[in-house]
Amino acid sequence: MEDKRKRGRRITDRITEAYYELMKIVAENNHERMFEYYVEDDEAYIFKIVNSSPAQETVYPVFKQNIDTYMSECPEDSIECFKKQLDKCLLRPMRTAFQFSFISEDGKSKPVEMYMISIPDLDKKVCMVVGVMFDIRDEKGLLDSLT
């Protein structure tokens, strides 16, 4: 029986790895930005996937305390929306989706949709929040081209 469990875990690990690789391809093709927040370190990263690897990474140390500074170019309601959703994710493992305006590296405001998922540790305490954000205009343009 133990042998079957080990084999099952190996298969599960390979499936998880395959889905992770698939998600990187999707993120790269859709020009999505990935978000990772490590609760214990209070450090966040925003990056995009290029050639199946994280690229153009921006590091935000002491993130929670400095969200207002890091997002200072964003509209106030966007900052509050982001903070509220992050706080919800930090309370318990959950998923959320929301829209806000994000200032990109070219200095322009982009309306984005963001999905966040909180990841618990073995004690079911949230240890990480991951997310993906994409420009709503890109999605609207794609939908318009299909209709």
Residue ranges and their predicted role:
Residues V26-N29, L91-M94, K110:
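Short loop/turn motifs at secondary-structure junctions and domain boundaries
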